[in-house]
Amino acid sequence: KHHIASDIGCHLFSIMPPFELGATTMGYGLGPASASAFNSPDAKRRSISFVGDGGFWHNGLTSSIGNAVFNRNDGVIVVVDNFYSAATGGQDILSSRADNRSKSTRHPITEAIKGMGVTWVRHIERTYDVGQMRAALKEALTTEEKGPKVIVASSECMLNRQRREAPLKKQAAAEGRRMVKTKFGVDEDVCTGDHA
């Protein structure tokens, strides 16, 4: 098994059933830092750690990415990039893709990571493409390249997307324009009852 570590954030829910993925949790931006002890040269498997984009900018760039480079850690770091600091309410951050009149946004996480000295960086633009995510993780876990392997996994936070689109849909409906409302449900022929 791989040691899996997270910081606090929505991705931390993976430690709960039915997935139960995770061994350690540390503060905002510190998932990769908490995995550093498991990245020794004699480790049989690479650790996997998660940090959200809010935590990445808050503390993770220096405490997690910078230290992984400095200590030549050989683990896999996944930056969950949902375009906002979703864990604290959806505020814009440096890498937010929204136009913000009073803040500077649209600074790519990948560029900051490369600027810290990470050479193995992959960016998945649509994390709902499970095959692409799986392939990136497999490559990160099996590559011969030493040093930290960082995957930036980008997809917009669905809560913030709903908040962003709701007023636009309301206005369009008020103007008499036709609107499509996406609905989700459970396919009882496929569902295993695991609440995933």
Show which residues each predicted segment covers.
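Disulfide-bonded cysteines in secreted/extracellular proteins and peptides
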Residues: 10, 157, 191-194
